[in-house]
Amino acid sequence: MAFDMPRAIRPAEVGLAPERLNRLADALKNDIDKGFVPGAVVLIARRGKIACLEAFGYRDREARAPMAPDTIFRIASMTKPFTSVAAMMLAEEGKLLLADPVARYLPEFANLKVAVDSDNPSAKKLAKEPMRREMTVHDLLRHTSGLTYSHLTGPLLKKAYEAANIADEKQTNAEMVAKLGELPLAYQPGSTWQYGLSTDVLGRVVEVAGGTDLDRFIIERICKPLGLADTGFGPIDAARSAQPQVDPASGNRPPMRDTALRPKWIAPAVGAHREAEAKADAKLRRWRQCTEQDRSRRAAPDFRRQVIGRHERNG
């Protein structure tokens, strides 16, 4: 694959110490030799130039298939920024407001309850109270919605999440939201930062406000304009795909979703413990660049400042 970013002749040209880059390479090789990881691709860029682009180890250790700079990885929760920028694009276009109640787009969230003392492991009953204020789109973007992951909350709320089968891979985004609408939040909206399903719900907001499926919005409005040809949802080129290594304890390779099929549930923010929905190679650095530098036109400067700004004092 071609990288359109120029290469630095020497790391020092962009203010990086070559001996420290060598330490990174040595550390990775050591971890690969010890079996901690099967392989890795490292890309370090600074001042608009690539200072380091190197592949280490194997993309499939059991098949002894070497890692390459254009190996495709499942990027798990790195899908979150794509979903968040999609929402910011719609906000820029006036199709949603960050201050809007989520219930404006998802009526299922109009009368949510909040679990009381949800983290208490000794609680005997899942007590609930009304929301003190409505959940907003801004809450979804900054993970202050009160939504969580089942494994990050107390036993009673975890049991409720699992009973509702929130992580069902056969469901649609709309079906997932309908289930969440029947469950209490872990915290009052705006009161607590909690990594969780906020971005999954934001993905459904994008679908409603944008009038199309989340995966199609991301591909057509973000990936194609940026030239991210190897980034998307769905089929992965098996000849370039990184594979999980065999679990030494079981002797089995961890199961992976069949990427030859388009999933019904386009989950934009699955945690690292689950399979990812999106795939990408080292061109992901172009995405990072375009969300940080003014030359990107995926979002206007004021919106980019909101994306990378601090939000803990905003309510």
Q: Model segments located where?
A:
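N-terminal pre-domain segments of enzymes
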Residues: M1-P11
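Short, surface-exposed loop or secondary-structure junction motifs
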Residues: F3-D4, R104-G315
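Short hydrophobic "helix-edge" motifs at membrane interfaces and signal-peptide entry regions
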Residues: R7-A8, D70, V201-L202
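Short, conserved catalytic-motif segment at the N-terminal edge
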Residues: A12-I75, K95-L97, N111-D119
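Active-site SXXK
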Residues: N22-K29, G48-I50, R74-Y105, A110, ...
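Hydrophobic residues in alpha-helical segments
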Residues: I32, A91, L284-R288
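Short secondary-structure junction motifs
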Residues: V37-G39, E93, L97-A99, L180, ...
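Short beta-to-alpha loop/turn elements within the nucleotide-binding domains of ABC transporters
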Residues: E54, D100, T212
